[in-house]
């Protein structure tokens, strides 16, 4: 069986939620949240994660509008994601991230965690949801 190594990112203005998957590509898990400081420092952190996890693909959530259109925020996300993918020398795939942050907050409330006090956890969980959506769409997994 082919080993899957993808990194999911939830890109925000202040933070980047990061998620990884198990080698089978079945389960995505939140790894960390990077508090953005500068592009260079952010890339140092991401590069280390990529090396440690032997990442082969970058998956970024794209915030489409509720009508399914690429709006201003999605354009900004695409631009930053392409810059990150180039810096990390990784192929890039986008996935619809609509409502992932809301879904992450709901999950936290179910676990009796106050989302307002754990913004980094929201980003990390949203990144895991983004990566899980991508993994669930991959054809190599359904042929087992």
UniProtKB/Swiss-Prot annotation:
Keywords per UniProt: Cytoplasm, Hydrolase, Nuclease, Ribosome biogenesis
UniProt enzyme class: hydrolase
Location(s) in or outside the cell: Cytoplasm
InterPro entries: RNaseH-like_sf, YqgF, YqgF/RNaseH-like_dom, YqgF/RNaseH-like_dom_sf
SUPFAM superfamilies: Ribonuclease H-like (SSF53098)
EC number of the protein: 3.1.-.-
Chief location bin: cytoplasm
Keyword Methyltransferase included in the entry's annotation: no
SMART domains: YqgFc (SM00732)
Single Gene Ontology BP annotation: rRNA 5'-end processing
Any Gene Ontology CC annotation: cytosol
Domain of life (superkingdom): Bacteria
GO molecular function, one term: nuclease activity
Family membership: Belongs to the YqgF nuclease family.
Role: Could be a nuclease involved in processing of the 5'-end of pre-16S rRNA.
NCBIfam families referenced in this protein's UniProt entry, alphabetically: RNAse_H_YqgF
Protein name per Swiss-Prot or TrEMBL: Putative pre-16S rRNA nuclease
Organism: Acaryochloris marina (strain MBIC 11017)
